[in-house]
């Protein structure tokens, strides 16, 4: 069955182009031109992903994401923001609110499809079984092994979960609260500074291969896992 994608975009030419590209790549697009019509599309069959413009008649994309996250049936639907707002502050705000990725207009159809597929791989249950590799660092979820080249790295279960999350969500900034929700879960009470402790332990575990540099502190915001030093 084709993956169902809700396209929330008020500019008809862009919306129609995106829907055409999605259909050509085997997706099932569903259109919404404003905030209210997008909310009305949130019913069964649920969208597998939402492409969301920042500015909408009747409300903003940020408000729409907050609406999604309040409802148990929609909070886990991945969101890719599709907007002309390209400033770092705007990107960080979108991601911190709950967007899974961010595409700045103008964009190419190939980039759009590639980013959609990347987000869907991250949320797919099958994806968690694949070995993840980045610059000589590999993580195998099945065997619970982390390697730098041919050498195994030792780390605790929480550091492993933290690294797994980072490696499946690279080049994005996450606040301590977001990391707590993703790695520890929303039903566990843990202080924000606990994240700092496990970040230090993770960096220590990654030192033998020099991969500790990939766990980067973003001052005033949180942490990012990046191959760009």
Curated annotation (Swiss-Prot):
Molecular function per GO: phosphorelay response regulator activity; transcription cis-regulatory region binding
PTM sites of type 4-aspartylphosphate: 53
GO BP term, example: phosphate ion transport
Response regulatory domain sequence ranges: 4-120
Annotated region of DNA binding: 129-227
Superkingdom of the source species: Bacteria
Subcellular location per the Swiss-Prot or TrEMBL entry: Cytoplasm
Function: This protein is a positive regulator for the phosphate regulon. Transcription of this operon is positively regulated by PhoB and PhoR when phosphate is limited.
Name of the protein: Phosphate regulon transcriptional regulatory protein PhoB
Gene designation: phoB
């Amino acid at each position: 069955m084709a993956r169902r994608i809700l396209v929330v975009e008020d500019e008809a030419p862009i919306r129609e182009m995106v829907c055409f590209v999605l259909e050509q790549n085997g997706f099932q697009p569903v259109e919404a031109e404003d905030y209210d019509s997008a909310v009305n599309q949130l019913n069964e069959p649920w969208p597998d992903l939402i492409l969301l413009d920042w500015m909408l008649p009747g409300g903003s994309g940020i408000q729409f994401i907050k609406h999604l996250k309040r409802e148990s049936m929609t909070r886990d639907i991945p969101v890719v923001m599709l907007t002309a707002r390209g400033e770092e502050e705007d990107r960080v705000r979108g991601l911190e609110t709950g967007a899974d990725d961010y595409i700045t207009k103008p964009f190419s159809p190939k980039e759009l499809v590639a980013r959609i597929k990347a987000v869907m791989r991250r949320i797919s249950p099958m994806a968690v079984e694949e070995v993840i590799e980045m610059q000589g660092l590999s993580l195998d979820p099945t065997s619970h092994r982390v390697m730098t080249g041919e050498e195994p790295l030792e780390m605790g279960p929480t550091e492993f979960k933290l690294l797994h999350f980072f490696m499946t969500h690279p080049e994005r900034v996450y606040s301590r609260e977001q990391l707590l929700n993703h790695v520890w879960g929303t039903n566990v009470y843990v202080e924000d500074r606990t994240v700092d402790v496990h970040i230090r332990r993770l960096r220590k575990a990654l030192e033998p291969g020099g991969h500790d540099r990939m766990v980067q502190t973003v001052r005033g915001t949180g942490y990012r896992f990046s191959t760009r030093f």
